């Protein structure tokens, strides 16, 4: 995959279930701590190096932000770092929270 793809939240759910995808949330730490998709990893400038070092780059990575805009650049960046596939989740956490309130956690 040379270019990331945009997917909706239902497609993201499917990839998490079927493809053993990684889910990362790039929102700020305070927003992530208040609420995030269950199982999401908080990806920040600080957590990026260990994340890249410890992740299986063959697994697809799904990127979530607030509304689905910032995640596009992050998904493309992760592709450039060696991930085999990267996806930006349209609607971001806000769409996820509305559609899947039972799959939202807080720290």
From Swiss-Prot:
Q: What InterPro entries does the database record attribute to this sequence?
A: GlpE_sulfurtransferase (IPR050229), Rhodanese-like_dom (IPR001763), Rhodanese-like_dom_sf (IPR036873), Thiosulf_sulfurTrfase (IPR023695)
One cellular component GO annotation, for this chain's record? Answer: cytoplasm
What reaction gets catalysed by this protein?
thiosulfate + hydrogen cyanide = thiocyanate + sulfite + 2 H(+); thiosulfate + [thioredoxin]-dithiol = [thioredoxin]-disulfide + hydrogen sulfide + sulfite + 2 H(+)
Q: Which compartment or compartments is the protein found in?
A: Cytoplasm
Superkingdom field? Bacteria
Catalytic residues, per the record, are 65
Q: What is its EC number?
A: 2.8.1.1
> Which GO molecular function terms does the record list?
thiosulfate-cyanide sulfurtransferase activity
Q: Which residues form the Rhodanese domain?
A: 17-105
Protein family (similarity comment) = Belongs to the GlpE family.
Q: What is this protein called?
A: Thiosulfate sulfurtransferase GlpE
Tell me which species this is from.
Erwinia tasmaniensis (strain DSM 17950 / CFBP 7177 / CIP 109463 / NCPPB 4357 / Et1/99)
